[in-house]
């Protein structure tokens, strides 16, 4: 819990670094647990920004493998994987990002997962854009932003519009 509290402090004040020993402690813990449940997913979901891509990708692959075995906490799994994908894209790690593009889509087949499906659409556009398909990538991201607007999700639309202009 102290580690989670520290992560919130670091996210609020970027001048406060996240302690490297916490990353080691969390990593040791996660890879000592046989099955990741809701606590472990929440832990990763709150700390993913502090992990380097090789470690984050290893965690993402483990999450993907566990959901295919158990199907538990599916919505939290999808959100966590989407966040990892977005992080890979923002850090220009397109090879790792491709893993998430390909593995998340089958998880979002349920039509009631509107937020997750639209975020997938946005990230797919960002992935295209970062891969050199600038025009089609921008079009896809703008479509996702428009969908948020149509659904009355103005804050989401505004947040992703900021992402679009980065």
Where in this protein do the model-derived segments appear?
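Solenoid-repeat scaffolds in large eukaryotic assemblies
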Residues: 1, 19, 56-57, 94-98, ...
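Hydrophobic alpha-helical segments and helix pairs
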Residues: 1-28
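Residue signature of alpha-solenoid helical repeat architecture, marking inter-repeat boundaries
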Residues: 1-2, 34-39, 75-76, 115-116, ...
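"A position-specific structural signal for the A-helix of alpha-solenoid helical repeats
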Residues: 3-10, 42-46, 79, 83-87, ...
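Hydrophobic/aromatic side-chain positions at a characteristic register within alpha-helices
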Residues: 11, 15-18, 48, 89-92, ...
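Amphipathic alpha-helical segments of tetratricopeptide repeats
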Residues: 25-31, 64-69, 101-110, 142-153
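Alpha-helical adaptor scaffolds
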Residues: 40-114
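Long, positively charged, glycine-interspersed low-complexity recognition regions
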Residues: 107-166
């Amino acid at each position: 819990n102290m580690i989670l509290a520290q992560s919130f402090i670091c996210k609020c004040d970027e001048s406060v670094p996240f302690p490297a020993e916490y990353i080691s402690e969390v990593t040791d813990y996660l890879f000592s647990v046989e099955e990741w449940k809701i606590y472990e997913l929440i832990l990763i979901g709150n700390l993913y920004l502090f992990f380097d891509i090789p470690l984050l990708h290893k965690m993402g692959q483990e999450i993907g493998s566990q959901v295919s075995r158990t199907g538990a906490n599916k919505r939290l799994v999808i959100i966590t994987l989407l966040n990892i994908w977005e992080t890979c894209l923002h850090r220009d790690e397109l090879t790792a990002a491709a893993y998430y593009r390909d593995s998340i889509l089958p998880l979002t087949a349920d039509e009631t997962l509107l937020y997750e499906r639209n975020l997938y659409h946005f990230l797919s556009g960002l992935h295209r854009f970062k891969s050199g398909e600038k025009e089609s990538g921008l079009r896809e991201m703008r479509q996702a932003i428009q969908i948020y607007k149509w659904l009355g999700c103005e804050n989401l639309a505004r947040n992703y519009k900021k992402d679009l202009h980065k």
